[in-house]
Amino acid sequence: MNLISIPAFQDNYIWVLSENNGRCIIVDPGEAAPVLAAIEENQWQPEAILLTHHHQDHVGGVKQLREKFPSIVVYGPAETQDKGVTQVVGDGDRLSILGHDFSIFSTPGHTLGHICYYSEPYLFCGDTMFSGGCGRLFEGTAEQMYQSFMKINALPEETLICCAHEYTLANMKFALSILPDDRDINDYYHKVNELRAKKQKTLPVTLKNERRINLFLRVNDIDLIDKINKETNLQHSVARFAWLRSKKDDF
């Protein structure tokens, strides 16, 4: 399958998996216009929509797309039932779409009902994980988001993280503020800065990359523990995760 990202709003990405014959799967269409334009340009035939959570910038285009393509199947968690979903899915479910298998797992934190879709090598993680960061805790707890990150971290290192926002540069600036001497973070920051200066995308990224530069995956690293312990003594990984999220909220 071919992976395409369609820019939307200020910093969203709507992901599309397309076959050479034009049949495609659309992920989190927050608005319909750019998707419809891409469909016309590429002569796609939409077969399914995957929704990760209920926020409007991820579901806003569903109604118009269903009107245009009445046979399209819309999958999503229970919290998206009133957003145009035709089939509710949840943790442990498996889908076969266009001959490709998708595993679904619950990733609460950003919202309580947030889910991710994994079809090797792609992970569509919505607003759970960003490159270098994690989603805001609008409904869930740091404990829930930490456990969601651990689920993602259990996937193969070559997994391609297809998150829904271009937040990478801001996240790397935050990471540098925490660990300014970290070589991996510095190197990645400069790479991302160059890409964004050229208006190029930083996504998708590999899980291997995130394990190196995403502080929320490194809460048990000695360098980060030492940094945190200079301000407060936090013995538990979840507490350190919560500390990081709080710092990012105020950054």
Curated annotation (Swiss-Prot):
Pfam families reported in the protein's UniProt record: HAGH_C, Lactamase_B
Cofactor binding note from Swiss-Prot or TrEMBL: Binds 2 Zn(2+) ions per subunit.
Coiled-coil blocks: none
InterPro entries listed in its UniProt record: Clx_II_MBL, Glyoxalase_II_hydrolase, HAGH_C, Hydroxyacylglutathione_Hdrlase, Metallo-B-lactamas, RibonucZ/Hydroxyglut_hydro
A single GO molecular function term of this UniProt record: metal ion binding
EC number(s) on file: 3.1.2.6
Superkingdom in the source lineage: Bacteria
Organism: Klebsiella pneumoniae subsp. pneumoniae (strain ATCC 700721 / MGH 78578)
Protein name as catalogued: Hydroxyacylglutathione hydrolase
Cofactor field: Zn(2+)
Positions contributing to Zn(2+) 2 binding: 57-58, 127, 165
Subunit structure: Monomer.
Pathway where it operates: Secondary metabolite metabolism; methylglyoxal degradation; (R)-lactate from methylglyoxal: step 2/2
GO biological process annotation, one example: methylglyoxal catabolic process to D-lactate via S-lactoyl-glutathione
The UniProt record lists the keyword Cell inner membrane: no
CDD domains from the UniProt entry: hydroxyacylglutathione_hydrolase_MBL-fold
Keyword list, A-Z: Hydrolase, Metal-binding, Zinc
Gene3D superfamilies: Ribonuclease Z/Hydroxyacylglutathione hydrolase-like
